[in-house]
Amino acid sequence: MKKILIRTATGLVYIALILIATLCGPYAFLSIFSIIAALGIAEMLKLCTKDEKPSVATTVIDILGGMAFFILSFSHYFPDFSVINPLWAGIGYILLRGIMQLYDKRRNAIRQLSASYMAMFLVVFPLSLLSKLYLEANGHTTLLACLIFIWMNDTGAFCVGSLIGRHRLFERISPKKSWEGFWGGLFFTIVAAVIIGTYFPAYFSEFDVIRWVGLAIVVSAFSTWGDLAESMVKRTAGVKDSGHLLPGHGGILDRIDSLLFVVPAVLIYINFVI
């Protein structure tokens, strides 16, 4: 019972922070998600270099470089940041990180560089794409809908999978996930999309019901793939959770793994499908 209460309290605090970031303006969004990016980088580095810790210097560069790239991705909204193009900042980071590795004689260069670049590619880059979604007209409501869909997908997958899950979805990577759970998550997500499009069109005014349902299907599928991708990394590292930051939930990557795959997929859906 105590574990359930801790897990519930942690989940509510996390959801509250994400809602504050999404609904309380760009400065709140930038501040909260910058911290999330930094924590995600640190966890990914730890997962990918489990047997060989990176140096403090390279870890600091990875975290600062990732936060800088994320913040600069909002440069078109914040004129003070527009003097530096995030593309050039990213190129500068890649060069600096590679040069730093030349002077680290004690560690495996391939493993260390792979961990750093993987953290940038799998954590920072998808989070940076949030700027493309959030800063569009009414983009914050689209992002809010995506978050609702992710949470409903997780809830549906857990409830249905726990009750009637029999057929393994991807046993090699995540033995507990089932096809029944997947379809349950998809059903919950589609129901949420229908409710949003039917009963809250004044607030969620970007799309009609059909397009919201299409978005829900995209979110459900890529949310599952994102979860599986992080499970693959954790299984390779031989750990159950990405960290211990969130009591009852694991690490920050355990909470945002779905979002990291959903954001790029949603942008493709919005820009090229509808």
Feature annotation, model-predicted:
Residues 189-190, 255, 262, 271:
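Hydrophobic transmembrane alpha-helices of multi-pass small-molecule transporters
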Residues 43, 154, 227, 254-257:
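Acidic active-site catalytic centers that drive phospho-/nucleotidyl reactions
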Residues 235-258:
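Interfacial loop-to-transmembrane junctions
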Residues 162-163, 233-238, 260, 265:
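Re-entrant/interfacial helical elements at transmembrane boundaries that shape
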Residues 152-162, 223-235:
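Short helical (or helix-break) motifs at transmembrane helix termini and adjacent helical loops
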